[in-house]
């Protein structure tokens, strides 16, 4: 069964590769794209559902009314609405780009064999998930992925470097290149998370004990905490999403950040595990590879068309931004963003 699941995950990757090769650039006019973005902002601006994450004290203090939308097309056009300048911590969205760094350095199999590419069926910070897969470490098919905390901490540990600073330079580097500007850590969030990350420390110790982490697990947890504390605004996140939509090339700066051949595998993991327990529901509704963060950010990728991001801190029970899900769904529907939806030929 585990091998079947792995084959299915790579089948999703193959399908995504085909989409990347054939999808046209967004067909709507610039005015229509901006209209779709503005309409979503107006419709959901006053939505009061959800609440800020509070298990990290700094996140509970973020303005719950913060709401910004940005969309960046693969030809570099930028559309925005609301607050696109205020930074929040990137949180779990960083997992995508650290995973991309590992895949860029070591190939797709590095993640598939060490961590896995399957949904765990457990919470994103579950220790039970680690216990459930420890017996299959090294078999090539662990039931884990790099977008839940255990897999993400392992992924961070796989970034190569002689020192912690050297590893960090690579991690922040791929985030900078994807966003198209120099990003920095929000020190208040980093301190808050460092003071309250006992569960992640336990996860790191277990992952080391069971062979998922082969370096200093305390360093891996610290670097993971630091990457989750990177400050980003909605435009940064949309540009990062658009870099993946554009087969690894930042459409604003023109820099190739990720090998195009490796992007489909990254999108496949986002498609199956990007929104925690609600990943299947999200993919069923939108078809978009996506990743959320408990800081209130959400990115989604329409391969070959655009990347979109929303920042809105109040979360639902699964840990995903309520406004962001609604806004991205509405905009994607208006622009035909679902990569699985084809127009029948007459």
What annotation goes with each model-predicted range?
Residues 22-27:
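Sec/Tat signal peptide C-region and signal peptidase I cleavage site
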């Amino acid at each position: 069964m585990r091998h079947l699941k792995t084959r299915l995950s790579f089948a999703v990757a193959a399908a995504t590769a085909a989409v990347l090769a054939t999808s046209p650039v967004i067909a709507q006019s610039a005015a229509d794209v901006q209209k779709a973005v503005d309409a979503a902002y107006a419709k959901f601006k006053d939505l009061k559902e959800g609440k800020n994450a509070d298990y990290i004290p700094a996140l509970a203090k973020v303005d719950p009314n913060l709401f910004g939308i940005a969309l960046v097309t693969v030809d570099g056009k930028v559309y925005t609405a609301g607050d696109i300048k205020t930074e929040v911590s990137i949180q779990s969205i960083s997992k995508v780009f650290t995973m991309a760094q590992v895949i860029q350095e070591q190939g797709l199999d590095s993640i598939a064999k060490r961590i896995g590419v399957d949904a765990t069926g457990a919470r994103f910070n579950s220790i039970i998930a680690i216990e459930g897969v420890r017996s299959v470490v090294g078999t090539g098919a662990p039931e884990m992925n790099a977008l839940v905390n255990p897999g993400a901490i392992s992924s961070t540990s796989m970034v190569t470097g002689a020192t912690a600073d050297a590893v960090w330079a690579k991690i922040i580097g791929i985030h900078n290149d994807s966003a198209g500007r120099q990003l920095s850590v929000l020190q208040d969030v980093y301190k808050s998370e460092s003071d309250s990350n006992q569960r992640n420390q336990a996860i790191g110790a277990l992952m080391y004990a069971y062979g998922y982490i082969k370096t200093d697990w305390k360093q891996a947890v610290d670097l993971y905490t630091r990457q989750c504390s990177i400050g980003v605004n909605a435009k940064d996140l949309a540009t990062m999403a658009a870099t993946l939509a554009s087969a690894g090339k930042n459409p604003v700066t023109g820099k190739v950040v990720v090998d195009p051949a490796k992007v489909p595998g990254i999108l496949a993991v986002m498609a199956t595990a990007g929104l925690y327990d609600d990943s299947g529901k999200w993919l069923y509704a939108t078809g978009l590879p996506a990743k959320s963060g408990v800081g209130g950010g959400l990115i989604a990728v329409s391969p070959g068309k655009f990347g979109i991001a929303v920042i809105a801190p109040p979360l639902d029970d699964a840990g995903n931004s309520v406004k962001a899900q609604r806004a991205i769904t509405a905009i994607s529907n208006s622009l035909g963003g679902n990569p699985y939806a084809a127009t029948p030929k007459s």
